[in-house]
């Protein structure tokens, strides 16, 4: 979209701002898994929104992942930096004319931070409607309906749920030969 298209649509559209992380998800999944899954869900939701105009913004790839820093490939922001960057992106969306903004989370470590940013922004901008949610929480009722949402596996971390999503999105990026075979290892963030 160009600036004029965004300007025309923003006042009546919902902006979806995907947030994620670049971090390890076991030896078998790519480090960009959180971003790829969150973007796919955001785009799918936008397509399925019917008459509701949904514009998906570019994602905030980098999350707060200090607990994964011992692993190679992790690109993490300190929680204060992440929150400040996200606040300013939400502010930019509002300045572009969006009145309704959903911060869509794709990384467990961001949950409390995105909720706080949404609260802080609404307190400072009472006319704004900003919500924050993880994609797996939004999808949980449908996942439970097909018995895919046991408490231990959604979203998990590099476990069955996330690996299945990656296999669906781009199976070439999943190293099937490196998938842990013991159930206990599948959702362990240390693997």
Regions found by a protein language model. Name each.
Residues 1-102, 108-191:
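Extended, histidine- and acidic-residue-enriched regions that form the cofactor-binding/catalytic faces
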């Amino acid at each position: 979209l160009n600036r004029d298209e965004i300007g025309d649509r923003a006042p009546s559209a919902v902006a979806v701002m995907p947030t994620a992380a670049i971090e390890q998800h076991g030896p078998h999944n790519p480090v960009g898994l959180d971003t790829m899954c969150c973007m796919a869900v955001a785009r799918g939701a936008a397509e399925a929104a019917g008459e509701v105009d949904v514009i998906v913004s570019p994602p905030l790839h980098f999350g707060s992942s200090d607990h994964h820093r011992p692993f190679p490939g992790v690109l993490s922001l300190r929680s204060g930096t992440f929150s400040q960057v996200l606040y300013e992106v939400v502010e930019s969306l509002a300045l572009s004319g969006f009145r309704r903004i959903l911060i869509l989370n794709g990384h467990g470590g961001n949950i409390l931070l995105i909720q706080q940013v949404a609260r802080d922004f609404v307190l400072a901008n009472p006319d704004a409607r900003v919500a924050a949610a993880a994609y797996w929480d939004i999808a949980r009722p449908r996942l439970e309906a097909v018995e895919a949402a046991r408490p231990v596996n959604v979203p998990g971390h590099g476990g069955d749920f996330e690996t299945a999503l990656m296999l669906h999105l781009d199976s070439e990026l999943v190293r099937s030969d490196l998938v842990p075979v013991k159930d206990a290892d599948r959702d362990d963030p240390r693997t």
